[in-house]
Protein backbone atom coordinates (compact mmCIF):
# COMPACT_ATOMS: atom_id res chain seq x y z
CA UNK A 1 0.00 0.00 0.00
CA UNK A 2 1.06 3.54 -0.63
CA UNK A 3 -0.48 6.95 -0.18
CA UNK A 4 -1.81 9.14 -2.97
CA UNK A 5 1.08 11.54 -2.39
CA UNK A 6 3.63 8.70 -2.69
CA UNK A 7 1.91 7.51 -5.87
CA UNK A 8 2.10 10.98 -7.42
CA UNK A 9 5.79 11.26 -6.48
CA UNK A 10 6.54 7.88 -8.06
CA UNK A 11 4.81 8.96 -11.27
CA UNK A 12 6.78 12.22 -11.31
CA UNK A 13 10.01 10.27 -10.85
CA UNK A 14 9.07 7.82 -13.62
CA UNK A 15 7.98 10.40 -16.21
CA UNK A 16 11.51 11.18 -17.36
CA UNK A 17 12.87 7.65 -16.92
CA UNK A 18 10.68 5.37 -19.05
CA UNK A 19 12.11 4.07 -22.31
CA UNK A 20 12.06 0.91 -24.39
CA UNK A 21 14.57 -0.85 -26.54
CA UNK A 22 13.81 -1.08 -30.25
CA UNK A 23 16.21 -2.26 -32.96
CA UNK A 24 19.16 -1.88 -30.62
CA UNK A 25 18.29 1.70 -29.67
CA UNK A 26 16.82 3.09 -26.48
CA UNK A 27 13.69 5.13 -27.27
CA UNK A 28 12.53 7.54 -24.57
CA UNK A 29 8.80 7.55 -23.78
CA UNK A 30 7.72 11.19 -23.79
CA UNK A 31 6.09 12.50 -20.63
CA UNK A 32 3.08 13.67 -22.68
CA UNK A 33 2.50 10.01 -23.63
CA UNK A 34 2.29 8.81 -20.02
CA UNK A 35 -1.11 9.04 -18.32
CA UNK A 36 -1.75 8.15 -14.68
CA UNK A 37 -4.90 6.00 -14.47
CA UNK A 38 -6.64 3.76 -11.95
CA UNK A 39 -6.96 4.65 -8.29
CA UNK A 40 -4.21 7.25 -8.65
CA UNK A 41 -6.23 9.22 -11.23
CA UNK A 42 -9.34 8.80 -9.08
CA UNK A 43 -7.28 10.30 -6.24
CA UNK A 44 -8.04 7.59 -3.73
CA UNK A 45 -6.20 8.17 -0.45
CA UNK A 46 -4.55 4.73 -0.39
CA UNK A 47 -3.32 2.88 -3.47
CA UNK A 48 -2.56 -0.80 -3.97
CA UNK A 49 -0.40 -0.01 -6.99
CA UNK A 50 0.46 2.66 -9.53
CA UNK A 51 -1.23 2.37 -12.94
CA UNK A 52 0.21 4.12 -15.99
CA UNK A 53 -1.08 4.18 -19.54
CA UNK A 54 1.56 4.64 -22.23
CA UNK A 55 0.32 6.10 -25.50
CA UNK A 56 2.23 4.50 -28.37
CA UNK A 57 2.57 6.75 -31.44
CA UNK A 58 2.91 4.03 -34.07
CA UNK A 59 1.19 0.65 -34.33
CA UNK A 60 4.43 -1.05 -35.39
CA UNK A 61 5.97 -0.11 -32.02
CA UNK A 62 3.11 -1.49 -29.91
CA UNK A 63 4.51 -5.01 -29.58
CA UNK A 64 7.95 -3.68 -28.60
CA UNK A 65 7.21 -1.16 -25.84
CA UNK A 66 6.28 -3.22 -22.77
CA UNK A 67 8.33 -6.37 -23.41
CA UNK A 68 11.40 -4.14 -23.78
CA UNK A 69 10.63 -1.58 -21.07
CA UNK A 70 13.52 0.15 -19.32
CA UNK A 71 13.41 2.45 -16.29
CA UNK A 72 16.51 4.59 -15.86
CA UNK A 73 17.98 4.49 -12.35
CA UNK A 74 15.20 2.26 -10.98
CA UNK A 75 15.60 -1.30 -9.81
CA UNK A 76 12.64 -3.36 -11.00
CA UNK A 77 11.51 -6.89 -11.71
CA UNK A 78 8.86 -8.01 -14.15
CA UNK A 79 6.10 -10.25 -12.80
CA UNK A 80 4.28 -10.68 -16.12
CA UNK A 81 4.51 -8.78 -19.37
CA UNK A 82 2.75 -8.78 -22.71
CA UNK A 83 2.07 -6.36 -25.54
CA UNK A 84 -0.73 -4.47 -23.77
CA UNK A 85 -0.05 -4.94 -20.04
CA UNK A 86 3.01 -5.32 -17.87
CA UNK A 87 3.13 -5.83 -14.10
CA UNK A 88 6.38 -4.76 -12.47
CA UNK A 89 7.72 -4.42 -8.98
CA UNK A 90 9.80 -1.28 -8.59
CA UNK A 91 12.16 -0.24 -5.81
CA UNK A 92 11.47 3.32 -4.69
CA UNK A 93 12.90 4.87 -1.55
CA UNK A 94 13.79 1.47 -0.05
CA UNK A 95 10.30 0.02 -0.58
CA UNK A 96 8.84 -2.19 -3.28
CA UNK A 97 5.68 -1.15 -5.11
CA UNK A 98 3.63 -2.67 -7.89
CA UNK A 99 3.58 -0.74 -11.16
CA UNK A 100 1.02 -1.73 -13.79
CA UNK A 101 1.77 -0.44 -17.27
CA UNK A 102 -0.75 -0.48 -20.09
CA UNK A 103 -0.39 0.56 -23.73
CA UNK A 104 -2.80 2.12 -26.20
CA UNK A 105 -2.51 3.63 -29.64
CA UNK A 106 -3.21 7.36 -29.96
CA UNK A 107 -6.67 6.74 -31.47
CA UNK A 108 -7.52 4.44 -28.53
CA UNK A 109 -6.46 6.94 -25.86
CA UNK A 110 -9.92 8.26 -24.77
CA UNK A 111 -11.29 4.72 -24.51
CA UNK A 112 -8.21 3.40 -22.69
CA UNK A 113 -8.15 6.32 -20.24
CA UNK A 114 -11.81 5.69 -19.37
CA UNK A 115 -11.33 1.92 -19.15
CA UNK A 116 -8.22 2.00 -16.97
CA UNK A 117 -9.43 4.86 -14.76
CA UNK A 118 -12.80 3.30 -13.94
CA UNK A 119 -13.99 2.55 -11.35
CA UNK A 120 -15.56 -0.73 -12.41
CA UNK A 121 -19.02 0.19 -11.06
CA UNK A 122 -19.04 3.34 -13.23
CA UNK A 123 -17.98 1.40 -16.33
CA UNK A 124 -20.59 -1.30 -15.73
CA UNK A 125 -23.39 1.29 -15.75
CA UNK A 126 -22.12 2.93 -18.94
CA UNK A 127 -21.62 -0.38 -20.72
CA UNK A 128 -25.03 -1.69 -19.64
CA UNK A 129 -26.75 1.40 -21.05
CA UNK A 130 -24.79 1.10 -24.30
CA UNK A 131 -25.52 -2.62 -24.59
CA UNK A 132 -29.25 -1.83 -24.69
CA UNK A 133 -28.48 0.17 -27.85
CA UNK A 134 -26.41 -2.73 -29.27
CA UNK A 135 -23.06 -1.06 -28.62
CA UNK A 136 -19.97 -2.48 -26.98
CA UNK A 137 -17.40 -0.24 -25.30
CA UNK A 138 -13.92 -1.35 -24.30
CA UNK A 139 -10.41 0.06 -24.03
CA UNK A 140 -9.94 -0.08 -27.80
CA UNK A 141 -13.07 1.74 -28.96
CA UNK A 142 -16.83 1.76 -29.39
CA UNK A 143 -18.28 -1.04 -31.50
CA UNK A 144 -21.64 -1.79 -33.07
CA UNK A 145 -22.09 -5.30 -34.50
CA UNK A 146 -18.34 -5.90 -34.03
CA UNK A 147 -17.53 -2.89 -36.23
CA UNK A 148 -15.60 0.05 -34.85
CA UNK A 149 -17.73 3.18 -34.66
CA UNK A 150 -15.48 6.12 -35.58
CA UNK A 151 -15.92 9.07 -33.23
CA UNK A 152 -14.15 12.39 -33.70
CA UNK A 153 -12.93 12.65 -30.13
CA UNK A 154 -9.54 13.05 -28.49
CA UNK A 155 -10.34 13.09 -24.77
CA UNK A 156 -12.16 10.97 -22.22
CA UNK A 157 -14.48 13.92 -21.50
CA UNK A 158 -15.46 14.18 -25.19
CA UNK A 159 -16.06 10.41 -25.25
CA UNK A 160 -18.41 10.48 -22.25
CA UNK A 161 -20.39 13.38 -23.72
CA UNK A 162 -20.51 11.75 -27.18
CA UNK A 163 -21.97 8.62 -25.56
CA UNK A 164 -24.72 10.75 -24.00
CA UNK A 165 -23.56 10.66 -20.39
CA UNK A 166 -22.66 13.40 -17.96
CA UNK A 167 -18.93 13.68 -17.46
CA UNK A 168 -17.75 13.29 -13.89
CA UNK A 169 -14.21 13.91 -12.81
CA UNK A 170 -12.55 10.62 -11.84
CA UNK A 171 -12.60 11.21 -8.07
CA UNK A 172 -16.39 11.84 -8.18
CA UNK A 173 -17.21 8.58 -10.00
CA UNK A 174 -19.07 5.88 -8.10
UniProtKB/Swiss-Prot annotation:
Region described as Involved in ssDNA binding: 42-51
Cofactor(s) annotated in UniProt: Mg(2+)
Example GO biological process: double-strand break repair via nonhomologous end joining
Covalent S-S links between cysteines: 81-86
Matching Gene3D superfamilies: Beta Polymerase, domain 2, DNA polymerase, thumb domain
Entry note: cofactor: In the presence of magnesium, pol X shows a strong preference for the ssDNA gaps having one and two nucleotides.
Reaction catalyzed: DNA(n) + a 2'-deoxyribonucleoside 5'-triphosphate = DNA(n+1) + diphosphate
GO molecular function, one term: metal ion binding
Top-rank taxon, per record: Viruses
Site features described as Stabilizes dGTP in a syn conformation to overcome the Watson-Crick base pairing constraint, chain residue numbers: 115
UniProt keyword GTP-binding present: no
InterPro entries for the chain: DNA_pol-X_BS (IPR019843), DNA_Pol_thumb_sf (IPR037160), DNA_pol_X (IPR022312), NT_sf (IPR043519), PolB_thumb (IPR029398)
EC annotation from Swiss-Prot or TrEMBL: 2.7.7.7
Keywords from the named record: Disulfide bond, DNA damage, DNA repair, DNA-binding, DNA-directed DNA polymerase, Magnesium, Metal-binding, Nucleotidyltransferase, Transferase, Virion
Additional notes on this entry: Consistent with its intracellular location, ASFV encodes its own replicative DNA polymerase and three base excision repair enzymes: a class II AP endonuclease, the repair polymerase Pol X, and an ATP-dependent DNA ligase.
PANTHER family, alphabetized: DNA POLYMERASE LAMBDA (PTHR11276:SF28), DNA POLYMERASE TYPE-X FAMILY MEMBER (PTHR11276)
Family to which the UniProt record says this protein belongs: Belongs to the DNA polymerase type-X family.
Protein name per the record: Repair DNA polymerase X
Organism name: African swine fever virus (isolate Warthog/Namibia/Wart80/1980)
Amino acid sequence: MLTLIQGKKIVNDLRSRLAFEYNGQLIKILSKNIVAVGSLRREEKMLNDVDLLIIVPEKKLLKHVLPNIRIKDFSFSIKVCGERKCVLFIEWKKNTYQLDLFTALAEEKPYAVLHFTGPVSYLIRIRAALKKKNYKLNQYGLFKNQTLVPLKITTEKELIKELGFTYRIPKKRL
